[in-house]
Regions:
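S-adenosyl-L-methionine
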Residues: 2-114, 152-181
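Conserved class I S-adenosyl-L-methionine
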Residues: 115-125
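Conserved SAM-binding loop of SAM-dependent methyltransferases across substrates and taxa
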Residues: 126-138
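Conserved short alpha-helix immediately C-terminal to the canonical SAM/SAH-binding motif I
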Residues: 129, 148-149
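Conserved SAM-binding motif I beta-strand of class I
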Residues: 139-144
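A short SAM/SAH-binding and catalytic strip from SAM-dependent methyltransferases
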Residues: 183-199
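C-terminal substrate-binding/active-site "lid" region of AdoMet-derived donor-dependent transferases
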Residues: 197-264
Length: 275
């Protein structure tokens, strides 16, 4: 599958970038400037990704750099103020630590390849996964409890004119029937040991009592960090929840995220369906 290879190429390029990165930014990521053999991505979609970064206030600088022969634009930014704000919510599952924009695009593309038609990002941060889903013509919804982050999403929406439907609400309280979903994929924003399991359990229980159960995919972001995983090493820390709720893993892909920039192993995204 094409996106498996693109994901592998991105992981490899990230390692090269990490070795050569001499900046001092709080966060940094790159997006290829144009389509290539390693990144055969629609040029218009690439442009939309650059637009997201250019119009997102968390990034304050960008420059072009060749990484392993591929011309990329590097975006540098700072999420400290958003991070500090995001930890004040009692039921918020995780501080704001986004995935990379290109990782968000690949993750949404994989969901689309399984013929899912709607994407709901739970704990969506600055909305990047929902934004990419909208670019890919999926019906997207971006659910975030933090009002400051939703304000940020609305700024991006206004500037890019891509409406990825940000909703400021507690995902645990939200009534998903309002979205009229038919074949949705839910992305759970939160690592299992940082409250993501509470969020996931709630969503799974809501879905499993409806007709959606047979047509739903749930995607978890995992971790391979031993420090964060006490009891549960497999499936990125999600295996006990996956087993408990009778889910089956249909795909796992590793993608760079802000929190794995300096690590050799990136973040596993685990795609599951109800059995």
């Amino acid at each position: 599958m094409m996106f498996d290879q693109i994901a592998k190429n991105l992981v490899m390029l990230k390692q090269e970038f990490f070795k050569s990165y001499a900046g001092h930014s709080h966060i940094q990521e790159f997006i290829p400037v144009s389509t290539s053999e390693s990144f055969p991505i629609n040029d218009i979609h690439l442009e939309f990704m650059h637009d997201f970064a250019a119009k997102n206030p968390i990034y304050h600088n960008y420059y072009e750099q060749k990484i392993a022969g591929i011309l990329c634009k590097v975006y540098e930014g700072d999420i400290n103020e958003y991070w500090l704000n995001s930890i004040k919510h009692g039921s918020s599952c995780q501080p704001f630590y986004p995935t990379w924009i290109l990782s968000a695009y690949i993750a949404a593309s994989i969901a689309k390849s399984f013929d899912y038609t709607e994407l709901v990002d739970i704990g969506s941060g600055d909305g990047r996964i929902a934004y990419c889903a909208k670019v890919l013509d999926l019906q997207s919804t971006s659910i975030e409890i933090d009002d400051v982050l939703v304000e940020l999403q609305n700024t991006i929406l206004t500037e890019t004119k891509i409406n990825f439907n940000p909703i400021c609400t507690d995902a645990i309280e939200f009534d998903y029937s309002l979205l009229n979903l038919t074949r949705p994929v839910f992305f759970i924003g939160g690592l299992p040991q940082m409250g993501g399991d509470v969020l996931a359990t709630n969503i799974i229980e809501k879905i499993s009592t409806t007709h959606l159960k047979n047509n739903t995919c749930i995607v978890f972001a995992g971790t391979h960090s031993k420090r964060q995983l006490s009891d549960n090493q497999s499936e990125g820390g999600w295996s006990s929840l996956i087993d408990k709720h009778g889910l089956k893993v249909i795909k796992t892909v590793s993608l760079p995220t802000i929190w794995t920039f300096d690590q050799l192993i990136d973040t596993p995204y685990i795609y599951t369906e109800f059995t």
